[in-house]
Structures are given as structure tokens and as C-alpha cells.
């Protein structure tokens, strides 16, 4: 009888501990997902406002920007430096660059996140192109930063 009671207590304790851990992980995961989304939203807000100061805060120091271009000979990948990207944004007037995204899949690990965002891009109010953005973010001491961004572009 004592063994049965001890066994039941162990089962209840294990179940309760597991449920508490799962709840804690869900809250942490939801919080991290919200933080990751905020970095991406800040990036697009900075682009829309041509705000290079805010824009720079969204990226790691060694961020990689790439675009997949569809050529008759096949896909090619173009790479741009962070400074070139930020300078190109800074040359625009506010509201000239309007990239409208939807959050697709979001995967968050304690130190890394992957986000897929379909988008439609408007330049000075006119449709320009659409495609998919794929973000890789890293959680540094100061918070989430975009480490890698690659996109596709279609008319």
C-alpha cells in the first residue's frame, strides 16, 4: 500500500512539474515570438520612414542581405552590404518604400529564430513587386537582431 501511494505521489509530482514547464515554455516562446516580430516590424517601419537610425538597430554587425534574382539562365543570388542597404534607404523620402508583409511561419529557439514573410512592395505608391522574405535572427545580449535576410522578387 505504501508503495502504491508513493508511486501515485511520484506520478502526480512528475505530471505537475511537466505541465508547469510546458506552460513556462509556451509563455517564453510566445514572448520571444512577439520580440522577433517586433524587430521585423521595426525594420519595415524604418524603411517606410527612411529612418536609418532605427533601421541600423534591427541588424547584427555582420548581417547578410541577399536577393534571389530569376534570370533566363537560372536563379542568381545578389549580395548587398549593410552600409549599402542603409544608404539606399536613407536616400528615399518618407513613405516612398512601402513593403507590406504578412507573417507566415515563425520558428523560435532560445538563441535563433526563422521567419518567413510573404510581401508586396510599393514604391512611391505604385506596385513594384512581390515575393518572400526569409529572416534569420539571433538573440544577442542586447536582444534579437536580424543576422540574415534573403528575398525573392516577382512582378
Q: At which residue positions do the language-model features occur?
A:
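Short beta-strand edge/turn micro-motifs at domain boundaries
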Residues: 130-155
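Short, low-complexity N-terminal intrinsically disordered segments enriched in polar/charged residues
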Residues: 20-53, 57
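A mature extracytoplasmic/lumenal domain signature
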Residues: 59-61, 69, 117-121, 150
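Hydrophobic pocket/interface hotspot
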Residues: 43, 55, 63, 115, ...
Amino acid at each position: 500500500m505504501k508503495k502504491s501511494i508513493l508511486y501515485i505521489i511520484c506520478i502526480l509530482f512528475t505530471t505537475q512539474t511537466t505541465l508547469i514547464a510546458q506552460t513556462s515554455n509556451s509563455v517564453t516562446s510566445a514572448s520571444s515570438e512577439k520580440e522577433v516580430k517586433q524587430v521585423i516590424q521595426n525594420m519595415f517601419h524604418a524603411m517606410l520612414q527612411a529612418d536609418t537610425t532605427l533601421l541600423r538597430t534591427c541588424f547584427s554587425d555582420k548581417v547578410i542581405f541577399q536577393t534571389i534574382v530569376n534570370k533566363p539562365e537560372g536563379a542568381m543570388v545578389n549580395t548587398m552590404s549593410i552600409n549599402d542597404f542603409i544608404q539606399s534607404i536613407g536616400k528615399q523620402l518618407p513613405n516612398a518604400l512601402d513593403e507590406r508583409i504578412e507573417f507566415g511561419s515563425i520558428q523560435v529557439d532560445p538563441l535563433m529564430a526563422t521567419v518567413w514573410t510573404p510581401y508586396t512592395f510599393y514604391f512611391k505608391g505604385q506596385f513594384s513587386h512581390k515575393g518572400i522574405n526569409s529572416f534569420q535572427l539571433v538573440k544577442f545580449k542586447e536582444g534579437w537582431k536580424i543576422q540574415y535576410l534573403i528575398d525573392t522578387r516577382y512582378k
